[in-house]
Swiss-Prot record:
Residues 1-10, 198-210, 251-265 have a biased composition (Basic and acidic residues). PANTHER family: RRNA-PROCESSING PROTEIN EFG1. Keywords: Coiled coil, Nucleus, rRNA processing. This is rRNA-processing protein EFG1. GO terms for biological process: maturation of SSU-rRNA from tricistronic rRNA transcript (SSU-rRNA, 5.8S rRNA, LSU-rRNA). It comes from Phaeosphaeria nodorum (strain SN15 / ATCC MYA-4574 / FGSC 10173) (Glume blotch fungus). Involved in rRNA processing. It is found in: Nucleus, Nucleolus.
Amino acid sequence: MSQKRKHDDTPGDASSASKTFKKHRPFKPGQNHQQTKHHRRPNLSHDDENGRSTNALKSRIRDLKRFLTHMDSVEKHKMSAGARQERERELEACEHELAEKLNASREAEYRKKMIGKYHQVRFFDRQKGTRILKRLKKELSALEDDSKKTALQQRIHNAEVDVNYAIYYPLMKPYSSLYPKSKNKKSSDSEEAEDTGEDSKNSAEVDGPKGDVNMWKAIEEAMQDGTLEKLRYSKDAVPAEPPKKSKKPKAKDSKKEKSVSKTSHDASASHNYAVQDQDEDSDGGFFE
C-alpha cells in the first residue's frame, strides 16, 4: 500500500511560503506621492558642433565687457596688465566666433529660402532637359548618316549643359529658368501647343545657351574643370547683413512732452474747479 504524503510536503505550502508581501509605506500628509517627473535631456541640436551656442557666447561677451568696465571704473579692483590682456583676447575671440556663427546661420536660412522658392522651376527644367537628352541620344544611336552626327553631338552636349544647369545652378542665386513660359499666353494657345507634333517641339526648342547665359557658360566650363559642386555651393550671391536699426530718442522726448502737457492741463483744470467751488460757497454765504 502506498503511504500518504505528509501535510508539510504539499507543493501549495512551498509556493505560499515563497511569496513575498509588499510593504505599504505609511501615508504622510506633507509628502508628495505623485510620480517623480523626469527631467528632459537638453536638446543639443540647437547648439553648434562644439557645444557653444550663440546665446552662451552673447552672455560671455556681456560678462567680459561688464567686468572690464568695472575694473576701469573702480580703482581698488585694478588687475594686472597680463590678466587684463588675457581677458581682452578672450573677448575678441568670443566676438569673432559669434560673428562667424551668425553669418553661418544667416547663410543657411537664406539657402533654405532660395531652395524652397525655386525648387519647382528647377525640377521642371531638369525633367524637360533629361527628356530632350534621352531623345537626342536615341536619335544619335539610330542615325546612319555620319555627316549629321557632329551637329547632333553638339546638341547632345548642349542638352547635357542644360541638365547640369538645372542641377548645379548656385543655390544662393535667384534662378533663371531655361524654358520660361510667357505670362500673356491664353488657354487656347496652350491647348493648341499640346496638340502639335514633334516637329513643332523641335522647332520651338532653343539650342545653345539659354536662361542666364553667363551662368550657362560658367556651368559649361565647370563641367570641363570638374568644379560643379563648388559652383553650386558658392556664396557670391549671399546678401550683406542689414544694418542695425538705431533707436529714435525723439519719440521718447515727444512722449515726455505729451505727458508733461497732460499733467499741466489736468492741474489747471483742477485749479479752475477749485476756484469755481470757492465762488459758489461764497455766494451761498452772502445770501444767507
